[in-house]
Amino acid sequence: MNRKILHLNNSHIFLIGMMGSGKTTIGQLLAKKIMLPFIDTDAMIEHSEGLSIQEIFSTKGEEYFRSLEVKCLENILNSKSGQIVACGGGLPIISGVMEQMKRAGIVVFLASDPELAYNRIQAQSNRPLLGQIESFRQLYNSRIQTYKNANITCAANGTPNEVVLLVLNALTQFEF
């Protein structure tokens, strides 16, 4: 393991990108490789609310959900040790959030082709804000500029293991 990566124990690695970009899968594999705890903000919210993300959106609305995301991020930022964090796709879009994440660690944008991401999640019924491919592309286009402000951008069109290797390589080259 690269010496730089071993020094990440006090820094968070935030994985951002569209739903379907592989944040959870890549995050879990990456956490095993570099021996840091893994957190998925959507899973944390579902657990604390006792509802799926889709149910939260449909019963309480997007604004309420975004407030839960901010609270979840605050809890993560208060942690004393580094973690791999799979962020909900809209979390970095919230005003000030990207800056907070960059101060607390490294933000990695998992850049996947919108059509590939859409196809990965099309069969899942628990995803909010997902309609036809055109609306998915519009959502992607509305978020891409913010995503590009990440510290690191990695192509996420390959297999999970290929993407993990790309992320690890990028982390070893990142200037702290």
What are the residue ranges of the model-derived segments?
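NTP-dependent small-molecule kinase module
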Residues: 2-8, 29, 33, 144-176
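ATP-dependent small-molecule kinase phosphotransfer cores
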Residues: 41-90, 95-100, 146
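Hydrophobic anchor at the beta1->P-loop junction of P-loop NTPases
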Residues: 15
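A glycine- and Lys/Arg-enriched "phosphate-lid" helix/loop adjacent to the NTP-binding pocket
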Residues: 104-145
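P-loop (Walker A) phosphate-binding loop of NTP-binding proteins
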Residues: 18
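ATP-binding Walker
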Residues: 21
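Walker A/P-loop
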Residues: 24
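Short glycine-rich anion-binding loops that position phosphate/pyrophosphate groups of nucleotides
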Residues: 88-91, 113-115, 159
